[in-house]
């Protein structure tokens, strides 16, 4: 069934209702914060946001006698939006409740546009983006490349992870091997694992230890199964593949941070089927394709669009085999998806 199209007035009413609900929630939250701050609160200390629940977040104490304990915290009204991975200053109250008083500067942030096109951070202080894909659902180079552009744009190290490699057979092996070869040639780290059978999981754990990582990828590629294998004590519900579409069903409902014994952390975030890049410019996308770096600025025309222009350095590199057709197709698809002002 086709998705119902809403007219302008219906959209306005929906936004008005959502705005009123948000205002009421903010008022209740402000009253709760005032009540807490009017009581007995502990001294200011550092904490780590490990989960987000609407107007409240879960904060783990990182130092002092409360280290390792988790508190459900309210936010002061003047604070910016917080996400999992944020480092904060907070004060503890009674019965596992606290108040966040300040957000500490972020080293990195992973953002994507929301349904209204506004840029929204989804994770903070991430060191590595693990791009998960699998033989089923069939991997798409375009989606992988979108994640890579996002990683390059955010200054976060990417790791390509092929899960369920035990499902590789004679039919899908040639295409998968060709796909992986492109990224290995570019110098991107690639791992092949099976969360179900345990193959390659030790190598993955070594990559994750000592870093804050986030798993991204379309639903059904086994992100929750990977978490269950890496952290058996954590129960992350696993969703089956849809028999009709071959796509996965979303299981994780909120971004949550988990600790590894080796000192690293993992942020398990909701599955993302189509990763939006509407917040980046053409120059950002071009910079996200690392094989373009030595070619950009060497075209005959300064405003070259790398389409059919004579003297285009990228087209010459494509012809010579220095740029793969698969990557050029992804680049053109991403550029075409940008809003006009992104050009």
Swiss-Prot record:
GO cellular component terms attached to this protein's record: cytoplasm
Zinc-finger among keywords: no
Subcellular location(s) of the protein: Cytoplasm
Residues given in the record as Zn(2+) binding sites: 299, 304, 306, 312
Listed SUPFAM superfamilies: P-loop containing nucleoside triphosphate hydrolases
Molecular function per GO: GTP binding; GTPase activity; metal ion binding; rRNA binding
Cofactor or coenzyme needed: Zn(2+)
Residues where GTP binds: 163-166, 217-225
GO biological process, alphabetically ordered: ribosomal small subunit biogenesis
Top-level taxon: Bacteria
Stretches assigned to the CP-type G domain: 116-275
Keyword RNA-binding among record annotations: yes
Gene3D superfamilies reported in the protein's UniProt record: Nucleic acid-binding proteins (2.40.50.140), P-loop containing nucleotide triphosphate hydrolases (3.40.50.300), Probable gtpase engc, domain 3 (1.10.40.50)
Membrane spanning stretches: none
Root EC class: hydrolase
Catalytic activity, EC: 3.6.1.-
One family name in Pfam for this protein: RsgA_GTPase
Cofactor binding mode and count: Binds 1 zinc ion per subunit.
Record-linked HAMAP family: GTPase_RsgA
Quaternary structure annotation from Swiss-Prot or TrEMBL: Monomer. Associates with 30S ribosomal subunit, binds 16S rRNA.
Function: One of several proteins that assist in the late maturation steps of the functional core of the 30S ribosomal subunit. Helps release RbfA from mature subunits. May play a role in the assembly of ribosomal proteins into the subunit. Circularly permuted GTPase that catalyzes slow GTP hydrolysis, GTPase activity is stimulated by the 30S ribosomal subunit.
The family this protein is said to belong to: Belongs to the TRAFAC class YlqF/YawG GTPase family. RsgA subfamily.
Protein name, entry field: Small ribosomal subunit biogenesis GTPase RsgA
Organism: Pseudomonas fluorescens (strain Pf0-1)
Lineage: Bacteria, Pseudomonadati, Pseudomonadota, Gammaproteobacteria, Pseudomonadales
Name of the gene encoding the protein in the UniProt record: rsgA
């Amino acid at each position: 069934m086709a998705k119902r199209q809403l007219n302008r007035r219906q959209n306005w009413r929906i936004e008005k209702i959502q705005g009123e609900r948000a205002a009421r929630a903010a008022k209740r939250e402000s009253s709760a914060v005032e009540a807490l701050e009017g009581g007995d609160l502990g001294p200011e200390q550092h904490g780590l946001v490990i989960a987000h629940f609407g107007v409240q977040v879960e904060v783990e104490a990182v130092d002092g006698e409360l280290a390792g304990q988790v508190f459900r915290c309210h936010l002061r009204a003047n604070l910016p939006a917080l996400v999992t991975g944020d480092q904060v200053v907070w004060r503890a109250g009674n019965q596992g409740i606290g108040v966040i008083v300040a957000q500490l500067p972020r080293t990195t942030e992973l953002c994507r546009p929301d349904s209204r096109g506004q840029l929204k951070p989804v994770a903070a202080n991430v060191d590595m983006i693990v791009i998960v894909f699998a033989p089923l659902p069939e991997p798409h180079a375009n989606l992988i490349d979108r994640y890579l552009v996002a990683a390059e744009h955010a200054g976060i190290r990417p790791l390509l992870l092929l899960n369920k490699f035990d499902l590789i057979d004679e039919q899908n092996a040639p295409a998968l091997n060709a796909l992986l070869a492109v990224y290995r040639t570019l110098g991107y780290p690639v791992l092949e694992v099976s969360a179900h059978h345990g193959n390659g999981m030790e190598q993955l754990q070594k990559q994750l230890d000592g870093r804050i990582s986030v798993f991204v990828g379309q639903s059904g590629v086994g992100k929750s199964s990977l978490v269950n294998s890496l952290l058996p004590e954590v129960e992350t519900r696993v969703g089956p593949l849809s028999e009709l579409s071959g796509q996965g069903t979303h299981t994780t409902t909120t971004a949550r941070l988990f600790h590894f014994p080796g000192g690293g952390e993992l942020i398990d975030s909701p599955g993302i089927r189509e990763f939006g890049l509407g917040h980046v410019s053409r120059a950002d996308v071009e910079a996200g394709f690392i094989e373009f770096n030595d070619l950009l600025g060497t075209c005959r025309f300064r405003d070259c669009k790398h389409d059919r222009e004579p003297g285009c350095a990228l087209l010459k590199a494509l012809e010579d085999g220095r740029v793969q057709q698969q990557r050029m197709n992804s680049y053109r698809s991403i550029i075409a998806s940008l809003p006009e002002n992104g050009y």
